[in-house]
Structures are given as structure tokens and as C-alpha cells.
Amino acid sequence: YCKNVNKALDEIVRVLKPGGVLVCSTYGSRHMQEISRLVSGYDKRIALEADKLFEKFGLDNGDKILKKHFSDVERRDYKDALVVDEAEPLVDYILSCHGNQKEYLVDKYTDFKKYVEKKLGKPMTITKEAGVCACRK
């Protein structure tokens, strides 16, 4: 979520004690892609992310960025998925995202919830593409 990843990493390297470890997590471009498709199916104008944060620092490029600042970078992918069978928690999650969805959904909450309930005729498996990197100077 920082604007200048390299500047933030420079500062972390500066203050990290000898023997210290930075552990950071991130996600990839396919993380929760089913939710984005679900929302887009309701209204194509909705974007759940204001910025594609995974493009600034994600699974596809994070270790390369970290290796510019740290001599030892170990990446571990976290294999996981989420199975959702209730509409209300999913709708609440969607409304909590950092995009423009509130602009289009707040006044249509009931209609959108019915749309999600219909789409959840059976449990939905949601891709979770995430991982962590452990970094040493």
C-alpha cells in the first residue's frame, strides 16, 4: 500500500538490526479473481481495487524487487482457497474493498445481494494466490 516501494525498502534495510529478518506478504494477479468476475457480471464499471497493487509489488515481481535490497530472499507460496456458500459475508467483503464499488452498490444493496445469492446456487471456490518473502541483509 505504500506509494514508493523502493524508498520504503531502503528505510527498512537502514533500520533492520544485524541478523534481523523482514517478512512481507503479498498476492498475485489471480488472487480472488472469481469475486472480481462476479462483481463485473453485475456491473462492468465496478473495480474492486483502485490500484492493481500486485503490479507494484506482487508474487510475480516481489522477490525481484526485494533482491535489489536484500542479499537473501526466500519466497514461500501459500496454497489456499476459500469456499463461500453465503451471500451476506461475501457482499460485506465486496463493500469493504478499496475500489469504486460503493459508488455503484450502496443504493442497490438488496438487488446486489439477491444477484449474489442467485450466483451462489452452489458453494463458490475462490482462488487465493498469496505468499510471503523472508529477507535478510
What are these regions (language model features)?
Residues 1-2:
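A short His-aromatic
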Residues 6-7, 13, 19-82, 101-106:
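Conserved catalytic/acceptor-binding region of the Class I
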Residues 53-137:
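Conserved Class I S-adenosyl-L-methionine
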